[in-house]
């Protein structure tokens, strides 16, 4: 059965057709609407899906935010242009005319990456560092979503009680410091207004402030991983996202994690499916894997 998989992120929307063997075809991307209206997201999704829907039998959505009974509830509304409450499943069922499943993007990615690991791995955590910071937890071979869909939102754990205010309302969240948006917000002087991609370029050129911002992000993520190891005793952690997969970033996270006491060490690896993990995980779930 062919699935129309959709990935809704803070900066881009992606869609593709995925067959029963998880082969991806006709991948398309559009920027996430900058305007803060449900209509803008609805129209963007319609434009994304329209060329693909005739060849699909079902829709699977991986989206940033909390998915609760088919509704998209943004824990940090800034990551989706201010959206607080959006009828995601209903909207796609109307646009595509197909049965639709929705799950958090990091949870979906965790499920895809879990299936790529050796069979003896039963406990793993996926972390995405991108516009925001998210996560997905697989425990004893089962994906944890939580009754309210909140499970795995690791970016909203505490990094610095005196840090910046996060879009979720807490002070000093991991996401507020380590995410691409958090790094950009902290940039000053000649880096003010730069996005995360530019900060990585400048860091590679030796710019002191840019190097500090990247290093600070990596250290915050490493400390969060130590907390995750203490909480879940996971066998491995897989890292994805545009920041997480940036050149040299994983190596910095690994170096900072090695500075933590030995019980908190855990194997780290880059996402095998890279930017397609959310699409593939959602398709896996729609094709019969249960939450």
UniProtKB/Swiss-Prot annotation:
Homodimer. HAMAP family: ManNAc_kinase. This is N-acetylmannosamine kinase. Its EC number is 2.7.1.60. It catalyses: an N-acyl-D-mannosamine + ATP = an N-acyl-D-mannosamine 6-phosphate + ADP + H(+). PROSITE patterns: ROK. GO terms for molecular function: ATP binding; N-acylmannosamine kinase activity; zinc ion binding. Coiled coil: none annotated. Pathway: Amino-sugar metabolism; N-acetylneuraminate degradation; D-fructose 6-phosphate from N-acetylneuraminate: step 2/5. Keywords: ATP-binding, Carbohydrate metabolism, Kinase, Metal-binding, Nucleotide-binding, Transferase, Zinc. It holds the Pfam family ROK. Catalyzes the phosphorylation of N-acetylmannosamine (ManNAc) to ManNAc-6-P. One of its GO terms (biological process) is N-acetylneuraminate catabolic process. Disulfide bonds: none annotated. ATP binds at residues 5-12, 132-139. It comes from Salmonella heidelberg (strain SL476). Belongs to the ROK (NagC/XylR) family. NanK subfamily. SUPFAM superfamilies: Actin-like ATPase domain. InterPro entries: ATPase_NBD, ManNAc_kinase_bac, ROK, ROK_cs. Zn(2+) binds at residues 156, 166, 168, 173.
């Amino acid at each position: 059965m062919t699935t129309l998989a959709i990935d809704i992120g803070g900066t881009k929307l992606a869609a593709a057709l995925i067959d029963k063997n998880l082969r991806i075809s006709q991948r398309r991307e559009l920027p996430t609407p900058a305007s803060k209206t449900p209509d803008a997201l609805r129209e963007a999704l319609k434009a994304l899906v329209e060329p693909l829907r005739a060849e699909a039998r079902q829709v699977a959505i991986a989206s940033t935010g909390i998915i609760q009974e088919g509704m998209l509830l943004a824990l940090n509304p800034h990551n989706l242009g201010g959206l607080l409450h959006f009828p995601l499943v209903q909207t796609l069922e109307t646009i595509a005319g197909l049965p639709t499943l929705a799950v958090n993007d990091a949870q979906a990615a965790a499920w895809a990456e879990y299936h790529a690991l050796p069979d003896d791995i039963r406990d793993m955590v996926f972390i995405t560092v991108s516009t925001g910071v998210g996560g997905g937890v697989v425990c004893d071979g089962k994906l944890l979503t939580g009754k309210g869909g909140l499970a795995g939102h690791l970016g909203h754990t505490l990094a610095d009680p005196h840090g910046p205010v996060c879009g979720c309302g807490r002070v000093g969240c991991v996401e507020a410091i380590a995410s691409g948006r958090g790094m950009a917000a902290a940039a000053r002087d000649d880096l003010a207004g730069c996005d995360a991609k530019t900060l990585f370029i400048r860091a590679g050129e030796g710019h002191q402030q840019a190097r500090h911002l990247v290093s600070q992000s990596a250290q915050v993520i490493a400390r969060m991983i130590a907390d995750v190891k203490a909480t879940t005793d996971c066998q491995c952690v897989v890292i994805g996202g545009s920041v997480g997969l940036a050149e040299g970033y994983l190596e910095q996270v690994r170096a900072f994690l090695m500075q933590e006491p030995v019980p908190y060490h855990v194997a780290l690896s880059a996402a095998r499916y890279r930017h397609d993990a959310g699409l593939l995980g959602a398709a896996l779930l729609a094709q019969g894997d249960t939450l």
